[in-house]
């Protein structure tokens, strides 16, 4: 679910900040880029988000050096992680008002899936916060987002270093499975606590004649990874070949 955000690494088209590709040029969907004010805003947004995820990365390293252990590092970066991941909700607005030519639906799913994992699982089930699986997806997200927002920033400035482009379309090969593994293991670790506490579940009878089993809902989310992960992963592999091979061909003609 949250891992679906990684598809942003391969389906982007436009002006910076949108999860499905803010910052990448699109001749097919938008021949003109955003105006100067919009570009300035998107550059600022992406710079701030890059800096935010760098703060998270530095926080992880400092906590590890201070403790001498990678266990329970989540607590050292909990606040900035929640703040900057929740801040990505603005990317839905960017798509909705048209300053980024990406799908509102797709971007909403991608952003909300991560926000869900942060707030409805990791925040709500305190017992999982010390799990190593949380650190696994946090590290994967952190590296991914630093690269992604840097990519968008430089693209908006029309000065994209090849190294950043290469990293964006290459490191997902490791980071995507790493993030998926961390997400699934975290949800799995939360299941017994959710079931025991009846967290977010609604039982009958009630005046609305409606029931909801959050435990079963989390299981369905985990099952959804089975068809989604290989489909998205191999699509991204295909996109990598196409984009990087095009870059290499372009270099030959320069």
From Swiss-Prot:
Pfam families: PTPLA (PF04387). Residues 198-214 are annotated as: May be involved in interaction with TECR. The chain crosses the membrane at residues 42-60, 80-97, 108-125, 131-146, 170-187, 218-235. The modification N-acetylalanine is found at residue 2. Its main location: endoplasmic reticulum. GO terms for biological process: fatty acid elongation; sphingolipid biosynthetic process; very long-chain fatty acid biosynthetic process. Residues 1-11 have a biased composition (Low complexity). Residues 1-33 are annotated as: Disordered. Residues 61-79, 126-130, 188-217 are lumenal. Residues 2-41, 98-107, 147-169, 236-254 are cytoplasmic. It is a multi-pass membrane protein. The keyword Transmembrane applies. Keywords: Acetylation, Endoplasmic reticulum, Fatty acid biosynthesis, Fatty acid metabolism, Glycoprotein, Lipid biosynthesis, Lipid metabolism, Lyase, Membrane, Transmembrane, Transmembrane helix. GO terms for cellular component: endoplasmic reticulum; endoplasmic reticulum membrane. Pathway: Lipid metabolism; fatty acid biosynthesis. Glycans are attached at residue 209. GO terms for molecular function: 3-hydroxyacyl-CoA dehydratase activity; enzyme binding; very-long-chain (3R)-3-hydroxyacyl-CoA dehydratase activity. Belongs to the very long-chain fatty acids dehydratase HACD family. Catalyzes the third of the very long-chain fatty acids (VLCFA) elongation four-step cycle (condensation, reduction, dehydration, and reduction). This endoplasmic reticulum-elongation process is characterized by the addition of two carbons to the lipid chain through each cycle. This enzyme catalyzes the dehydration of the 3-hydroxyacyl-CoA intermediate into trans-2,3-enoyl-CoA, within each cycle of elongation. Therefore, it participates in the production of various VLCFAs involved in multiple biological processes as precursors of membrane lipids and lipid mediators. PANTHER family: VERY-LONG-CHAIN (3R)-3-HYDROXYACYL-COA DEHYDRATASE (PTHR11035), VERY-LONG-CHAIN (3R)-3-HYDROXYACYL-COA DEHYDRATASE 2 (PTHR11035:SF17). This is Very-long-chain (3R)-3-hydroxyacyl-CoA dehydratase 2. It comes from Bos taurus.
């Amino acid at each position: 679910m949250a891992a679906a955000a990684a598809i942003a690494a391969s389906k982007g088209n436009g002006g910076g900040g949108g999860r499905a590709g803010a910052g990448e040029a699109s001749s097919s969907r938008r021949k003109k880029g955003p105006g100067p004010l919009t570009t300035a805003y998107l550059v600022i947004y992406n710079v701030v988000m890059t800096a935010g995820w760098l703060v998270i990365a530095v926080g992880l390293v400092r906590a590890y050096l201070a403790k001498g252990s990678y266990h329970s590092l989540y607590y050292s970066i909990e606040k900035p992680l929640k703040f900057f991941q929740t801040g990505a909700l603005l990317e839905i607005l960017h798509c909705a008002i048209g300053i980024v030519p990406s799908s509102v639906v797709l971007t909403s799913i991608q952003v909300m899936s991560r926000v869900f994992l942060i707030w409805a699982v990791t925040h709500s089930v305190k017992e999982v916060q010390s799990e190593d699986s949380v650190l696994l997806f946090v590290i994967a997200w952190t590296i991914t987002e630093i690269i992604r927002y840097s990519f968008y920033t430089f693209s908006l400035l029309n000065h994209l270093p090849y190294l950043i482009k290469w990293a964006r379309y290459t490191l997902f090969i490791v980071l995507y499975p790493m993030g998926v593994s961390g997400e699934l293991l975290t949800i799995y670790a939360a299941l017994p606590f959710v079931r025991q506490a009846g967290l977010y579940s609604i039982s009958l009878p009630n005046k609305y004649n409606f029931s909801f089993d959050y435990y079963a809902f989390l299981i369905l989310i985990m099952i959804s990874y089975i068809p989604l992960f290989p489909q998205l992963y191999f699509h991204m592999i295909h996109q990598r070949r196409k984009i990087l091979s095009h870059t290499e061909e372009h270099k030959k003609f320069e």
